[in-house]
């Protein structure tokens, strides 16, 4: 079977991080943007985050815990139990997270995703604030312009945020769902299903 990447390559469905930045700025205003529930992935999400941060003045990065949607763990439930933390209700600041859990490098890759994602945002020229929470509404205490990066729960997350008073909510499927400055796009999925191609280029899901 043809892999997605081969099909995408034959279609030339590529976009630049600058295309992402321009789309994010146009749709979310370029100020403080909440980026919530991303997966922890160097290949899939890191390059999207770079583009998003280039289109923002500040990024409030809200990570789900103890793991992301596809099971990449930041923490174990044992660690949460030991610290007396309830992931359903408790919101952790970066300071609190570090105080309780330290560095927490990823079990297989050795990457501290909290630090890694923070550095991507800073290097893209934006300020960063990191929080840990599992209720979508929490982000509304920080900003009303939000990109919800979850995949299977994205419609529900968007609904909760809009009902809670968010001004603008974009899913990953709403970014690059039309061409920006001649770059690639996917009308149905936008950035969903995309992969890093180079440091400054992303390979989108074939149309």
List the predicted regions and their residue ranges.
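Conserved mixed alpha/beta catalytic, RNA-binding, or beta-rich assembly cores of soluble enzyme
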Residues: 5-207
